[in-house]
Amino acid sequence: MAPPNDPVHSTFNVSKTHKKDNLFELSDGKLFVKNIPLLFDVPSNVSFSTFSSICQTSRAPLPLFHCAHSTSFKGGFLGFSKEEPSHHLMNSLGKFTGRDFLSIFRFKTWWSTQWVGHSGSDLQMETQWVLLDVPEIKSYVIIIPIIEGKFRSALHPGTDGHVLVCAESGSSQVKASSFRAIVYVHVSDNPYSLMKEAYTALRVYLNTFKLLEEKSVPSFVDKFGWCTWDAFYLTVEPAGVWQGVKEFAQGGVSPRFLIIDDGWQSINFDDQDPHEDAKNLVLGGTQMTARLHRLDEGEKFRKYKAGSLLGPHPPLFEPKKPKMLISKAIEIEHAEKARDKANQSGVTDLSQFDIQIEKLKKELNEMFGGDQQNSPQPMCKNGEELQFNSQGCESGSCNSEDTGMKVFTRDLRTHFKGLDDIYVWHALCGAWGGVRPGTTHLNTKIIPCKLSQGLDGTMDDLAVIKIAEGGIGLVHPDQADDFYDSMHSYLSEVGITGVKVDVIHTLEYVGEEYGGRVELAKKYYNGLSKSLAKNFNGTGLISSMQQCNDFLLLGTKQISMGRVGDDFWFQDPNGDPNGVYWLQGVHMIHCAYNSMWMGQIIQPDWDMFQSDHVCAKFHAASRAVCGGPVYVSDSLDGHDFDLLRKLVFPDGTIPKCQYFALPTRDCIFKNPLFDGKTTLKIWNLNKYGGVIGAFNCQGAGWDPKRKRIRGYSNCYKPMTGSVHVNDIEWDQLKEASEMGKAEEYAVYLNQAEKLFLTKPTTDKIPIPIAKFAPIGLTNMFNSGGAIQGLQYEEATGEGANCASAKVEVKGGGKFLAYTSVLPSKCYLNGAEVEFEWTSQDGKLILNLPWIEETSGISSLTFIF
């Protein structure tokens, strides 16, 4: 029996204390907020209910329950009713025009991004929320479509400024005609507090997800890592992974976590031998109709022999081989596209195209080693063939401890001592095409895909086309627990500490027979959460291709980290040569604006990048201040270690910010992608300071007519802008709130290497005569992130006339501080040291060593 106040099992009720009048009112066809009309021409079938009237009880923790109800007068729910029940209902919520808004919408099934406009008709399909500027009352209002019963909702554009809500179940067998709380609205005078308050209210009301503050995050959140994807694509193999980790170690930037991306699994196609892996797969896209035929590692990793890469003369791996394979596969892809284009244009004789394609495929096969790829199962020393069952476990009399993923991960950790975490990739349904029926112990059925009407307005996507072409081998939802536990328990046993779960939103395609998208998702997410808690310490999961309200509101009770951007693209897959530049700004916009809502629920992950990319410095600067992990997808022999050393300490940790990066207020309702005038600014907080990143992202964005993201060449130009200490929202983190009250700030411009003082427009507070402010390590992008401790002391008592500043710094390199007066002495780890100081600008500089014994921590004391 649970204790009376157990937060997990207790149900709390609203107290009968006096409640403030709600700030929203629906009357005379208008939705008012603080007596200001927000939505006009609201249909008579739309209802408004206060938060307190709908959310009378909750099983949320008591502090959150109280928090939600303390601001309940700021929010409420919209509902609507129809005469006829349906599985897909559309209704206007009213209209607005001439009012600035920021929104997040799905431009692909799995990815979302920002969009701004001035009327309800400017919204895009599948809008996940819209934030309205209400300057008449110096406030902001958010409208969030949510989940009610077995239905989820999204906002769509209507005519003449109307905002439409679309409620759908995802199954023609699941119908409804009315909703009381299908949309949530909330008002606040602070846009960042607004997001916190709104999602806290929804967490308490729905109780289907947890806030980030309630959960632990993966252990690598403050570390550096490497992901294999862009280095190998599907050709990933043990020797290549080993070579990659070795290159980083030799370069002095050792990864603390490794993600073995797509390509390691046991997959094949429906027309192939059900017990053999598909061969010679290279590019993403070629595997999207393939399915898992067993739940352990593929043959490439099963064949690995213990110690084979540990000896003094390990087998040589040609670093150029992956790029050669990828290059040849791209040739094949281009040839196939040329054939398809010719076919669509009416060409009847395609034989020359087919001959060319077959020639290229033969060349690719020879590059793989020809028939050598069709090798038998790995053999034991006694010649007996190893056998694996469908659950990923070995059987037979052979000693399986000598081969496979288990010994590979063991060898990696033996040789690379700092490698804490090894993750592997898998799709939510197993592989892109799910699990192949009849090949495992699971009850699996190929389900045809049916896309919702809302996705008609999204971008063409090869992944969607391929998945719809082959359907999904769906494990019955009643076996979701068994499915994930079978896979994850095996992975945990062989040294894998977590998983990157991709292709999450395919579930919405296949809900017809399983109670709809909400009910199907609940069973899968519940099974995934249980397995995560059991097998990966409750935290070892990165969610990806998940940027939709179904997942955020249903799948995050346990999951605490997720991608906030589309994939890093090093070039435009559609052939625009300028895409190598403008795609990087698009990626940054995705991450910054998605963090506004996702950051309330999961730790934002800004994805990997390549350190030798032409825009690597652009990416590196954003990762330095993003507040999440830093990892790259460098190809073999493709590293910029000088750049990486500005991001990563020698021990593989990073100077991580204390919060997650968000757009500054003056960017919220602007278009930093193609308005030709706005510079993206993002802010974050360090332990003893704040940081602002300013980026020129102009040159690309969403095209509503073409339904795709494209380049806007008229915006390829230099930008100017300004930053201010007030751009930092100090009050969003309790520990930083006092810093927002300072009269004066020392500001360091990282790229210009300039240091100066500035004053905000705040009430004056007493300050000491000697002004001192540590900046941090200037050789790091996030200089202030190196400051781990700060303490000011003033001598007291008769005759006392000195003061001191004690600073703890992690890392080695050039330490910079501002001081208005010359310190009389400086001590480094207890020993007096010399330093440089210039009176003109107050710069104090000294070089710090990296001290391995203290994990890089140095103690500085300045005496004044």
Give the role of each language-model region.
Residues 2-203:
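N-terminal accessory beta-strand-rich subdomains and adjacent acidic, glycine-rich linkers
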Residues 437-489, 493, 526-643, 657-679, ...:
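Glycan-recognition surfaces
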Residues 502, 742-765, 827-847:
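Solvent-exposed beta-strand/loop surfaces of large extracellular or lumenal domains
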Residues 759-789, 815, 838-864:
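C-terminal beta-strand-rich structural cap/linker in extracellular carbohydrate-active enzymes
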Residues 232-236, 265-269, 429-435, 506-510, ...:
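Flexible loop/turn segments at secondary-structure boundaries
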Residues 623-626, 631, 668-738, 766, ...:
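Carbohydrate-binding surface patches
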